[in-house]
From Swiss-Prot:
Segments traversing the membrane: 30-50
Name of the protein described by the UniProt record: Photosystem II reaction center protein K
Similarity remark: Belongs to the PsbK family.
Taxonomic lineage: Eukaryota, Viridiplantae, Streptophyta, Embryophyta, Tracheophyta
Localization: Plastid, Chloroplast thylakoid membrane
GN (gene name): psbK
PANTHER family referenced in this protein's UniProt entry, alphabetically: PHOTOSYSTEM II REACTION CENTER PROTEIN K, PTHR35325
A GO cellular component annotation in the UniProt record: chloroplast thylakoid membrane
GO BP annotations, alphabetical order: photosynthesis
Record-linked NCBIfam families: PRK02553.1
Organism this protein belongs to: Pinus koraiensis
Keyword Thylakoid listed: yes
Function noted in UniProt: One of the components of the core complex of photosystem II (PSII). PSII is a light-driven water:plastoquinone oxidoreductase that uses light energy to abstract electrons from H(2)O, generating O(2) and a proton gradient subsequently used for ATP formation. It consists of a core antenna complex that captures photons, and an electron transfer chain that converts photonic excitation into a charge separation.
Length: 59
């Protein structure tokens, strides 16, 4: 368990010092959870396309 915790801390440390990962301005801090989920949306729509095709083919 400590190894997993250490990996998570190392990962957070890398992202905090990386110039490609920025922080939102204070005025937009309330949108931080939404911004964390936004990169997953294309993956979900891609998976939804497969589910839709499976549902259509079973008719």
């Amino acid at each position: 368990m400590p190894v997993i915790f250490n990996i998570c801390l190392d990962d957070a440390f890398i992202h905090s010092n990386n110039p490609f990962f920025g922080k939102l301005p204070e005025a937009y801090a309330i949108f931080d959870p939404i911004v964390d989920v936004m990169p997953i949306i294309p993956v979900l729509s891609f998976l939804l396309a497969f589910v839709w095709q499976a549902a259509v083919s079973f008719r």
